[in-house]
């Protein structure tokens, strides 16, 4: 009980630490952002292998059916921190980016015989980017200069976070099923700003925002087929329910002309424009004596 309370307090304290984005990539500007791996330390050591992974000393949140394998004598707590170093190149130019983030906090324990539970905090998507481009254009409204320079700046932040509670059971020998029930929250703020060196040309700023408060359901199944006394194969299947997030994204367009001292703001809103897709996963893991594993998802 004391271990469970301690892990719960650590999970709650990590909610504030997880407020910032865990990426620095222009690809995160699309949709709800870049999808997070959501895998634990052992799974990442096997390049993200998860759907058929079934261990008694590891929490595998990507397939809740695996919770039924948790050891009855141990309480598992796992937390991860990531450091991202990326280099982007385009048109002979390059830029480096570094990002550090609290990746996940998960815990798991056996509740009854062949029944295990897990809870934790995971990132679902990450939004984080900041880049710009500029060029010269012919023609200008200003009588002082026949040419002008424009600059387009793109930036965004936030993402979606996920806190979950899951249970896995083995109702039949070698067959396990499980479910994760999650609460999703977060959103995004994205900016596109067009500025010109010519003060007579309008500066245009577009701000895209959305706030999400919704749920997520993930189902899992695992079947283990013994091959010998030391060898076995585990097949894993997962399904995540797709549904509307009931979110209303907004676009705010601000036109500003410093020379004429004129500003104008227009706002647009689209109802129920964001959805979670239906997702499916399948994987298999071959294990020899609990020491050698080979698998694919």
Residue ranges and their predicted role:
Residues 1-24:
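Bacterial Sec-dependent N-terminal signal peptides
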Residues 7, 57, 270-271:
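Residue-level detector of alpha-helical transmembrane segments in integral membrane proteins
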Residues 11-12, 54, 72, 189:
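Hydrophobic alpha-helical membrane-insertion segments
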Residues 13-14, 74, 184:
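Single-residue recognition of alpha-helix boundary sites
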Residues 18-125:
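N-terminal, post-signal peptide beta-strand-biased segments of exported outer-membrane/organellar beta-barrel
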Residues 20-44, 110-297:
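Outer-membrane beta-barrel porins/channels
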């Amino acid at each position: 009980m004391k271990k469970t309370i301690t892990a719960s307090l650590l999970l709650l304290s990590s909610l504030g630490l997880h407020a910032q984005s865990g990426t620095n990539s222009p690809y995160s500007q699309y949709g709800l952002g870049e999808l997070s791996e959501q895998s634990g330390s052992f799974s990442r050591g096997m390049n993200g292998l998860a759907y058929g992974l079934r261990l008694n000393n590891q929490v595998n949140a990507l397939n809740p059916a695996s919770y039924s394998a948790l050891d009855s004598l141990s309480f598992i707590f796992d937390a991860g921190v990531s450091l991202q170093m990326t280099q982007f190149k385009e048109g002979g130019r390059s830029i480096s980016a570094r990002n550090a983030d609290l990746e996940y906090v998960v815990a798991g324990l056996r509740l009854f015989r062949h029944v295990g539970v897990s809870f934790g905090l995971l990132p679902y998507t990450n939004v984080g980017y900041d880049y710009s481009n500029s060029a010269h254009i012919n023609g200008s409204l200003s009588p002082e200069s026949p040419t002008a320079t424009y600059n387009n700046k793109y930036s965004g932040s936030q993402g979606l976070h996920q806190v979950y509670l899951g249970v896995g059971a083995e109702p039949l020998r070698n067959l396990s099923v499980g479910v994760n029930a999650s609460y999703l929250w977060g959103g995004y703020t994205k900016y596109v700003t067009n500025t010109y060196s010519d003060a007579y040309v309008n500066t245009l700023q577009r701000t895209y925002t959305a706030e999400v408060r919704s749920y997520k359901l993930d189902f899992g199944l695992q079947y283990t087929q013994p091959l010998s006394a030391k060898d076995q194969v585990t097949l894993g299947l997962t399904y995540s329910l797709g549904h509307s997030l009931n979110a209303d994204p907004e676009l705010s367009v601000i036109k500003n002309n410093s020379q004429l001292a004129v500003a104008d703001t227009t706002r647009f809103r689209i109802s129920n424009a964001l959805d979670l897709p239906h997702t499916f996963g399948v994987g298999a893991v071959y294990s020899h004596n609990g020491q050698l594993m080979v698998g694919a998802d």
